[in-house]
Amino acid sequence: MEASRRFPEAEALSPEQAAHYLRYVKEAKEATKNGDLEEAFKLFNLAKDIFPNEKVLSRIQKIQEALEELAEQGDDEFTDVCNSGLLLYRELHNQLFEHQKEGIAFLYSLYRDGRKGGILADDMGLGKTVQIIAFLSGMFDASLVNHVLLIMPTNLINTWVKEFIKWTPGMRVKTFHGPSKDERTRNLNRIQQRNGVIITTYQMLINNWQQLSSFRGQEFVWDYVILDEAHKIKTSSTKSAICARAIPASNRLLLTGTPIQNNLQELWSLFDFACQGSLLGTLKTFKMEYENPITRAREKDATPGEKALGFKISENLMAIIKPYFLRRTKEDVQKKKSSNPEARLNEKNPDVDAICEMPSLSRKNDLIIWIRLVPLQEEIYRKFVSLDHIKELLMETRSPLAELGVLKKLCDHPRLLSARACCLLNLGTFSAQDGNEGEDSPDVDHIDQVTDDTLMEESGKMIFLMDLLKRLRDEGHQTLVFSQSRQILNIIERLLKNRHFKTLRIDGTVTHLLEREKRINLFQQNKDYSVFLLTTQVGGVGLTLTAATRVVIFDPSWNPATDAQAVDRVYRIGQKENVVVYRLITCGTVEEKIYRRQVFKDSLIRQTTGEKKNPFRYFSKQELRELFTIEDLQNSVTQLQLQSLHAAQRKSDIKLDEHIAYLQSLGIAGISDHDLMYTCDLSVKEELDVVEESHYIQQRVQKAQFLVEFESQNKEFLMEQQRTRNEGAWLREPVFPSSTKKKCPKLNKPQPQPSPLLSTHHTQEEDISSKMASVVIDDLPKEGEKQDLSSIKVNVTTLQDGKGTGSADSIATLPKGFGSVEELCTNSSLGMEKSFATKNEAVQKETLQEGPKQEALQEDPLESFNYVLSKSTKADIGPNLDQLKDDEILRHCNPWPIISITNESQNAESNVSIIEIADDLSASHSALQDAQASEAKLEEEPSASSPQYACDFNLFLEDSADNRQNFSSQSLEHVEKENSLCGSAPNSRAGFVHSKTCLSWEFSEKDDEPEEVVVKAKIRSKARRIVSDGEDEDDSFKDTSSINPFNTSLFQFSSVKQFDASTPKNDISPPGRFFSSQIPSSVNKSMNSRRSLASRRSLINMVLDHVEDMEERLDDSSEAKGPEDYPEEGVEESSGEASKYTEEDPSGETLSSENKSSWLMTSKPSALAQETSLGAPEPLSGEQLVGSPQDKAAEATNDYETLVKRGKELKECGKIQEALNCLVKALDIKSADPEVMLLTLSLYKQLNNN
């Protein structure tokens, strides 16, 4: 008898009493797992009445303590964040700063009020990461979200993962990143099947946007898509922006410390993405009605009327974006704290609150060091600007941008020029191999031959920098040195090493994340490293280097935000020392002009984001445009102007005054204070007086607001159509152009935007007429002359027995008065594919004949190209597409696209269908019937799906005046083509066909999946051992921490920030979340009354997740793994790769790893419930796992007790794998026994260690 075997002293019990005792104990354990502590308490007491023993009494005591603690805590476990309505776990809430709580309340207000998205634009270093994590914690706890996609630069992944572990250790967080395609797919499927957060990078998004936007052959809509460093999509025609738009999402959040970096069009791009086109109208209207007046008003020579108009338009823009936009600077936070020091005294626990008080930031002095060029630099600089033959010698291409590049290099160091140019300037020798040397070569041979003294004497900046760094090292400061050029860092590194400096360096060549982390930690912990060399683009984002107290910006950037990002690596929360920044700028050169433009852009940022109502105007339009004029190279006009304005405002102390006196002794031209810019606002009285007198200004503001609102409403009407064309683009096959694109010869910047929005002209009639199509109006150089190029893009997708997928992208010219797009969609169907193909062939011939005539007539000649679906095309275009970079603009130069459906493409489709059908002939009859039923169901609804699958018409009229507009669907196709050609497209035709084939199996399996057992109790550290089955079980459970791939800190409860709530709430929707699929819904309902996702449940969820990961890794590495164990990507990459697996599968079903949501499935013989649901034949004996006890398993398939007993015996004999097989089968029969589950966990752990 079981009871007597467990407890020898229980032999006095009758069989009936023993059975009752075991039943009560079992039911009490299940109640504990389900979080029903009252029921568990009652059942354990009943068991105690039958047979009192120490084990039962200890459990009763633990549950009683937990119930008492819960009664004391009540609903205070959660706290309403700033009375917003979002409840946040109290321990987490108490660790947040006040401004962070306000940020979380803002994020929740977006969701609560039905806004589709927003921008959190807090200054760098104020904790945007923590705000997002805490917000997601509250949303998951309240079951308001299930699936979140988080996109960020590569170097921030480790930071985010660590923050998630630190703040919400129970949240399910996976990464979609790294070299292992199988691991990426498994992590993504785990989040999509259940719930949680998936973290990926912008480059992964570009390569795998199709995979991220789909699941099992269907569109997958994320609850939230969150972009960190969202200024990556500031230009909406880049591949990052296009692919981000293709991800279906209910809500979108953007995080950036620099929402505007160059112009207001970047702000429009961010809001257009975040609000899905429903806020700021079209780019053309925004540029005309908002950007141009605001920009003109910021110039020093603007008229009073222009200043007043810009002021009111700026106010109106701020009012529009205010509900969707939140930005706080460090200065704002500090001022608010100092003005209200008693704000937190009314909290219940002031001791805890004191921990969360915003620390005082140290003082920052941002100095501009104006440096004179040395005679050699000045001579070359003057000759280059004034003499054409010098330009010809030093430049390979004649363009203003290239000229500016050469001038910038001359300001920094003449040796930055090519080896050939240095030879012509008598700066060194020139050899043949130097001619092929790259501009950014890390090892510059012609510099290696130059002495240190010569390198220093040739650059005024280098002379100053060496003296400065020596002084800072002697004073004990650690310094960051930023430059945009790796060659400059090479020179600085060489000079410093020869002077015995200990230096570290991070630039674009340090690609491994672990190596970056190692160098950062070394600098933070070791004071001996006095200088850290970084490139501005790589080292200026996402790093925390608060060990340094001095920052040197060697060369200014065109973008003020770039330099500001670099400074904020040091000046952020956690910095306790005063910070001094040195920006090195040469007098009278192009660098001074760049700095002027920085100041001007900064004024736009401050006014538009609400930091300043009317910032000071420093420069006129003419002063900003004079880039190539030579001014006084010994003194700076800008420095003299700023000194006269701000000299008396500098915040200083004795040490800083002494240091500035030392800097003046180094022969510099002067010092000005960058941090004092815009410290004094201009009076708005002048502007307000003009506004009151001018009825015109009020009308302009009303007109601008009306146009934006009107266009935004029209765009909402188009969103569904655009979504089916753009965000559902993963359903289409790639279309390969037959010829490469050529740049338009007369367009400087043909940069179309991938916007799902209308691009309208100025008249309301055109706005209204464009409701049914995306319209972009092309204004040719002469006003009034328009060239309308209309095209219809037809996508036809057919389901051939649910296997093959035929697609034909046909382009035809839309005749005038042909009717609306909606009518065309209504009249079309899947059966019209042949007629469309015939018409397109005729159109193709006519277009080819008329092409030369039309090109001759065009004032703005644009190239045309053809789309042909053929194998030869794929091979021809491949090398050209690989040259596209992430920031390249994807253009469509006024195309007359033509698509012909060739025999090759049709044959390819039919071959795929034949292969898939042939593979399925060996499947069981019932499985085929299920598949056919689902196919028939899909084919019965052609009218509902035809706009998305069959025919999708889009009318495009190009607008060259609005170069930023784009056709996102075509751009996505270009990204898709590029990815598919280079082998990185995640979903091939075979992959989608396979997913459709297995669709019926996947849905039928959901109800049979075992589920996780978790503790649903609001219990702190005192009651954390409720679910223990005794000391042995506790030990076995604790041992599972060794398989945690994140961090062992999940089980270190001493840290105050490792909270136990904020886990993804496990709902009961399929697929199941618990081990037992038989947990009644009423139990789960009662659990949500006042319970939090407390520590034990959170940690158990994490452990079970890690066990599943381990199991899948074991399955993947098993020599005898079944066909369902290999990842789905084997099908995606090539059909030939899966052949060796399909040979082992008698039923012909290739089951993907995403279907193994149960942690119990290790082999086909053990998946009895799945075989039953599929109706598949019993597996052959040859498919049994190596060494499995076939005789015992065959006899005891449905005998739970026998399987458990056999498993224990095998475990005692040391046969881990065989014991695991038996226990897995037992759990398939009855999965609610915690003793067997914990024993299985222990076996998995032992097997993994072995």
UniProtKB/Swiss-Prot annotation:
Gene Ontology MF annotations: ATP binding; ATP hydrolysis activity; DNA binding; DNA translocase activity; helicase activity
Assembly mode: Interacts with PLK1, which phosphorylates it. Both proteins are mutually dependent on each other for correct subcellular localization. Interacts (via N-terminal TPR repeat) with BEND3 (via BEN domains 1 and 3); the interaction is direct.
Organism lineage string: Eukaryota, Metazoa, Chordata, Craniata, Vertebrata
Occurrences of domain Helicase ATP-binding (ranges): 109-277
Segments of skewed composition (Basic and acidic residues): 1115-1124
Keywords in alphabetical order: ATP-binding, Cell cycle, Cell division, Centromere, Chromosome, DNA-binding, Helicase, Hydrolase, Kinetochore, Mitosis, Nucleotide-binding, Phosphoprotein, Repeat, TPR repeat
Alphabetized Gene3D superfamilies for the sequence: P-loop containing nucleotide triphosphate hydrolases (3.40.50.300), Tandem AAA-ATPase domain (3.40.50.10810)
Region of interest (Disordered), residue spans: 735-768, 926-946, 1061-1092, 1110-1199
TPR repeat residue numbers: 21-54, 1200-1233
Reactions catalysed, as given in the entry: ATP + H2O = ADP + phosphate + H(+)
E.C. numbers: 3.6.4.12
Domain Helicase C-terminal stretches: 464-620
Keyword Cell division among UniProt keywords: yes
Post-translational modification comment from the UniProt entry: Phosphorylation by PLK1 prevents the association with chromosome arms and restricts its localization to the kinetochore-centromere region.
Main location per the UniProt record: nucleus
Its biological purpose: DNA helicase that acts as a tension sensor that associates with catenated DNA which is stretched under tension until it is resolved during anaphase. Functions as ATP-dependent DNA translocase. Can promote Holliday junction branch migration (in vitro).
Cellular component terms per the entry's GO annotation: cytosol; kinetochore; membrane
Residue numbers carrying Phosphothreonine: 813, 1063
Post-translational modification Phosphoserine, affected residues: 14, 755, 774, 807, 810, 820, 969, 971, 995, 1004, 1028, 1069, 1098, 1118, 1181, 1188
The name this protein goes by in its record: DNA excision repair protein ERCC-6-like
